Amino acid sequence: MMLGVIGGSGFYTFFGSDARAVSVETPYGPPSAPITVGTVGDHEVAFLPRHGVKHEFSPHTVPYRANLWALRSLGVRRVFAPCAVGSLTPDLGPGSIVVPDQLVDRTSGRDDTYFDSGGIHVAFADPYCPTLRAAATGLPGVVDGGTMVVIQGPRFSTRAESRWFASQGFTLVNMTGYPEAVLARELEMCYAAVALVTDLDAGIEVGSGVRAVDVFAEFERNMPPFKKLVFEALEAVEVERTCTHCLTHSGVQLPFELP
């Protein structure tokens, strides 16, 4: 069973020249980019850059439904989602790698379901797959747990927003973690975010606040060890999928067949 990786800002490639590119059409249009398929350990792995190969898509315009549908149609059932995040606590500085266990949605107007009809309601109390999380958090230096609040973007938070997020106990702030996680759940795909802290958010940092140029520079600085960690997380996953946490449609009549 194929594994998937959805790369975030600055994470546009994953394999060498021996990987094959696959173009996939979906009922929701094309995904962000052609999907590349290669091998990591005992696994066949499909890689998709969330924002496109040249960062064509801002967080609010990413074709999330097409991306997840395309991966599932290729046989992907388990997905790691590397992403860039801001930290809402000084305890997690730039370069920290965190595997969150909770998510808060503060986006608006995004296409966040495949079930516009049919009365389908997925369980989402625990948004991330515990098996995939364990594979990543078992690696050295990875912080286990935390709440990631997802904002609409593409702008960064005001200081007041950032301080409010921190006061609620949120740990990380991001722009792409939703609806990606819930769409994966609707397609019964195991999903776990792996977050690289690129900055202290505006309510924590002094000076001018968060700047995109600094975020991308920090991500680029940390890309080699971050990619290495994702490779190691993939290698740590069992070949056969045994997790049932994300199989949310048992006994439910769906309005269409999943790919």
From Swiss-Prot:
Recorded hits in SUPFAM superfamilies, A to Z, give: Purine and uridine phosphorylases
| Binding positions (substrate) | 175, 199-201
The source's domain of life comes to Bacteria
Q: Name one GO biological process term.
A: L-methionine salvage from methylthioadenosine
Q: Where are the transmembrane segments?
A: none
Instruction: Give the quaternary structure.
Output: Homohexamer. Dimer of a homotrimer.
Q: Would you identify the family this protein belongs to, as annotated?
A: Belongs to the PNP/MTAP phosphorylase family. MTAP subfamily.
The record's function comment reads: Catalyzes the reversible phosphorylation of S-methyl-5'-thioadenosine (MTA) to adenine and 5-methylthioribose-1-phosphate. Involved in the breakdown of MTA, a major by-product of polyamine biosynthesis. Responsible for the first step in the methionine salvage pathway after MTA has been generated from S-adenosylmethionine. Has broad substrate specificity with 6-aminopurine nucleosides as preferred substrates.
Name of the protein in its database record: S-methyl-5'-thioadenosine phosphorylase
> Which gene name belongs to this protein?
mtnP
